[in-house]
Swiss-Prot record:
Its EC number is 4.2.1.11. Catalyzes the reversible conversion of 2-phosphoglycerate (2-PG) into phosphoenolpyruvate (PEP). It is essential for the degradation of carbohydrates via glycolysis. SUPFAM superfamilies: Enolase C-terminal domain-like (SSF51604), Enolase N-terminal domain-like (SSF54826). The lineage of its organism: Bacteria, Thermotogati, Thermotogota, Thermotogae, Petrotogales. It comes from Petrotoga mobilis (strain DSM 10674 / SJ95). GO terms for molecular function: magnesium ion binding; phosphopyruvate hydratase activity. Keywords: Cytoplasm, Glycolysis, Lyase, Magnesium, Metal-binding, Secreted. InterPro entries: Enolase, Enolase-like_C_sf, Enolase-like_N, Enolase_C, Enolase_CS, Enolase_N. This is Enolase. SMART domains: Enolase_C, Enolase_N. Its main location: cytoplasm. It catalyses: (2R)-2-phosphoglycerate = phosphoenolpyruvate + H2O. Belongs to the enolase family. Pathway: Carbohydrate degradation; glycolysis; pyruvate from D-glyceraldehyde 3-phosphate: step 4/5. (2R)-2-phosphoglycerate binds at Q167, K341, R370, S371, K392.
Length: 432
């Protein structure tokens, strides 16, 4: 018998709600020692077309078609039978059994939401069985790096009902010595931004990810407001706090005309690149995600060749946490960073594989939430486990976002003097 062995004795799933009030899957795995682990999967709004399939019921009379009873039943009636009896400490095997059972490239038979819920719950159960925090179980003795938070404080695009094309305007408090100080600085900027927007007559209600969603004259105006908020909080833009953007460009790309619609103008990929470069030259922008359409490999490669030595270019919809697409990006030098979302690929093992491939090719990895989140803080442990250096988990409001920040505070506290906050050194894929 293997030295570390704790058998899965039951797997149960149920339908619960995410932060948007839509159903999602929660799974609970019980081991032979009586230990349990549970996990809830998130759900995205601006989804890449190459993502693994999130199985929804499609019954318009039940949660407006968004029910997940099919996925829940797949866990309870199909997956459980196959994973009961497996060793919970063999995560790769647990995941492989589920992937083989599904048998499709994009998990369309069982649903990525069904497989991932069990995958995450099994990892939690195994960690609990050993009495280890999840980040130590997943990452081992060297898990010690706290991430630079990329805080989405102004929302646009698919995440808000306003007129901004760019989906996320984020702050990155990279010029600090600890996660705790970085988080505080971010919160102070968030509150100052609220005061400034309020004073100038803007609505300060928040979007899906907890950021503000004002109607502004242009995307650049959002950056200007953030710069003012950083200064009002007593910090220096470009020294302590930097700016990041997620364009989510596939959302404003017209496949027929091959043009991008930004600030009311139709632009080619080359014109859009020049637009981004003009912003990068003007403001302390350190990271830019999904600047082009998810099929525009050429646009990415040309842009990364131009500015990849000074900006982190992150592929999200481009890669969908998929090693095959990531390998293509590596071959084409498409980006110098990848966004990591567990539910884009649908298992813990495949997520770790994507991170490993990125690291081997000197790319950074940004671990990310989805716009439809829950109280589950798995990604906070994951980002420390793999020493990723960056996390995207929303703004400084809404419990579904704060749950991750609070878990990171706990982890930093627990690691004590061994905790590392790399700050600007986390940007290793940008040629210094």
């Amino acid at each position: 018998m293997e030295k570390f062995y704790d058998e899965i004795v039951s797997v149960k799933a149920r339908e619960v709600l995410d932060s948007r009030g839509n159903p999602t899957v929660e799974a609970e795995v019980t081991l032979s020692t009586g230990v349990t682990g549970s996990a809830i999967v998130p759900s995205g709004a601006s989804t890449g077309k190459f993502e693994a399939l999130e199985l929804r019921d499609g019954n318009k009379d039940y949660y407006m078609g968004k029910g997940v009873t099919k996925a829940v039943n797949n866990v309870n009636n199909i997956i459980e039978q196959e994973v009961v009896g497996l060793n919970a400490f063999d995560q790769v095997n647990v995941d492989r059994v589920m992937l083989d059972l599904d048998g499709t490239e994009n998990k369309e038979n069982l649903g990525a939401n069904a497989i991932l819920a069990v995958s995450m719950a099994a990892a939690r159960a195994a960690a609990n069985s050993l009495g280890l925090p999840l980040y130590k179980y997943l990452g081992g003795v060297n898990a010690k790096v706290l991430p630079v938070p990329m805080m989405n404080i102004i929302n646009g695009g698919q995440h808000a009902d306003n007129n901004l094309d760019i989906q996320e305007f984020m702050i990155m408090p990279a010029g600090f010595n600890s996660f705790k100080d970085a988080l505080r600085a971010g919160a102070e900027v968030f509150h100052n931004l609220k005061n400034i927007l309020k004073k100038e007559g803007h609505i300060t209600s928040v979007g899906d990810e907890g950021g503000f969603a004002p109607n502004l004259n242009s995307n650049e105006e959002a950056i200007k407001y953030i710069i003012r908020a950083i200064q009002a909080a007593g910090y220096e833009p470009g020294k302590q706090i930097f700016i990041a953007m997620d364009a989510a460009a596939s959302e404003f790309y017209n496949e027929e005309t091959k043009k991008y619609s930004v600030d009311g103008k139709e632009m080619s990929a080359a014109e859009l690149a020049e637009y981004y470069i003009s912003l990068i030259d003007k403001y302390p922008i350190k990271s830019l995600e999904d600047p082009f359409d998810q099929d525009d490999w050429e646009g990415y490669s040309e842009f990364t060749a131009k500015v990849g030595d000074r900006v982190q270019i992150v592929g999200d919809d481009l890669y969908v946490t998929n090693v095959k697409r990531l390998q293509k990006g590596i071959d084409l030098k498409a980006t110098n960073s990848i966004l990591i979302k567990l539910n884009q690929i649908g298992s813990v093992t495949e997520t770790l594989d994507a991170i490993e491939l990125a690291y081997k090719n000197n790319m950074t990895a940004v671990v990310s939430h989805r716009s439809g989140e829950t109280e589950d803080s798995f990604i906070a442990d994951l980002v420390v486990a793999v020493n990723a250096g960056f996390i995207k988990t929303g703004s400084l409001s809404r419990t579904d976002r704060i749950a991750k920040y609070n878990q990171l505070l706990r982890i930093e506290d627990e690691l004590g003097s061994t905790a590392q906050y790399r700050g600007l050194n986390a940007f290793y894929s940008i040629k210094k």
